[in-house]
Swiss-Prot record:
Belongs to the ATPase A chain family. It comes from Bos mutus grunniens. SUPFAM superfamilies: F1F0 ATP synthase subunit A. It is a multi-pass membrane protein. It catalyses: H(+)(in) = H(+)(out). This is ATP synthase F(0) complex subunit a. One of its GO terms (biological process) is proton motive force-driven ATP synthesis.
Length: 226
């Protein structure tokens, strides 16, 4: 457990050496580039996954919307790598901070909405009032649709923050329980350690899935406004 509420903001150190450089360079190690004519298996797998994700996300977009491909692929790589930072010992996950996620979500959401009002003003305004709405319900539905529109960035940020934070808290708690049980019951400690390993593997999957979900929702917002 942390000694105080501010312990997580202290620069992580090992043998008196700061780990900031290692933490900053860690994401780049996950996405190596090959200078050979024939790529190795890891680079080939990386390119295949990026092409698969790109194909799934951009299949719903028209030719004009295809221009967002580079931005969306950069976004999913950025979120995925920052999510994985928390699994590096003595490091900190930036995406557990609601302020960062909210700033990122609001910027992307606002860009999509402004693009929609600029390019398709009538269509964007029509989203506030579904077709065939009874006249007495028009004011209420306009208010509801407006609220739902402004809740979208909050939902994006809270979803990412909650899922990443919950996984890291579970790893922290089970890791502490494993250390406490080592002096009490070796068998129970071994079982808890196995659970910790499985949970860590699951957290790797959650980190990538949450990056995919965040980027997919941004892609859908862009699709509705382009």
């Amino acid at each position: 457990m942390n000694e105080n509420l501010f312990a997580s903001f202290i620069t992580p150190m090992i043998l008196g050496l700061p780990l900031v450089t290692l933490i900053v360079l860690f994401p780049s190690l996950l996405f190596p580039t090959s200078d050979r004519l024939v790529n190795n298996r890891f680079v080939t797998l990386q390119q295949w996954m990026l092409q698969l994700v790109s194909k799934q996300m951009m299949s719903i977009h028209n030719p004009k919307g295809q221009t967002w491909t580079l931005m969306l692929m950069s976004l999913i790589l950025f979120i995925g790598s920052t999510n994985l930072l928390g699994l590096l010992p003595h490091s900190f996950t930036p995406t557990t901070q609601l302020s960062m996620n909210l700033g990122m979500a609001i910027s992307l959401w606002a860009g999509a909405v402004i693009t929609g009002f600029r390019n398709k003003t009538k269509t964007s305004l029509a989203h506030f009032l579904p077709q065939g709405t009874p006249t007495p319900l028009i004011p209420m539905l306009v208010i509801i649709e407006t609220i739902s529109l402004f809740i979208q960035p909050m939902a994006l940020a809270v979803r990412l923050t909650a899922n990443i934070t919950a996984g890291h808290l579970l790893i922290h708690l089970i890791g502490g329980a494993t250390l406490a049980l080592m002096s009490i019951s070796a068998t129970t400690a071994l079982i808890t350690f196995i659970i910790l390993i499985l949970l860590t593997i699951l957290e790797f999957a959650v980190a990538m899935i949450q990056a995919y979900v965040f980027t997919l929702l941004v892609s859908l917002y862009l699709h509705d406004n382009t």
